[in-house]
Amino acid sequence: MNRIPVLLVGMLLVLGLRAQDAVKDQVVQAMKTGSPKELVAQFIPNIDLTVKEVSDVYSRAQAEQILRKFFNENPPVDMVIEHKGESKFGDKYYIGILRTRTGYFRVTFFLKRTEDTYQVKQLRIENSKNDL
C-alpha cells in the first residue's frame, strides 16, 4: 500500500526532469541554429533579456526582433552547455558558450516552472572573456 504513493512521487519527479531537459534542449538547439522564433517559444510572456551590453524586460515579440538582429550579425556555429545548477529560489540555470562566425559568447538562461512545464525567464548573451 505505501509503495504506490512513493512510486507516484518518483514518476512525477522523473517527468518534471524530462520536461526541464526538453526545454533546455530546445533552447540549445534554437541557439545553435539561430532561430529566434523557436527560442522565444520557450520564454515567459515578458523576459529579462540581455544581449551584449543592452538589458531590459521585453515582450516575446520584442525579444524575437532583438535576437533576430543578434543572430544576423553573429551567425551561430555551435553551442555547448558547460555548467548547470539551481538557484536559491529553485530556478534551474544553464551556462554555455555560443560559438559564432564573429566570436564566442557566454550564454546563461534560467528556467522557471510554470504550471506543468518550464519556461525561460531570463536569458543573457554576453561577450566571452576567453575564446576557446
Named regions from a protein language model:
Residues 38-39:
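Solenoid-repeat scaffolds in large eukaryotic assemblies
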Residues 22, 43-80:
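Short solvent-exposed beta->alpha transition segments
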Residues 104-132:
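Short beta-strand edge/turn micro-motifs at domain boundaries
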Residues 20-35:
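Short, aromatic-enriched amphipathic alpha-helices that serve as compact interaction elements
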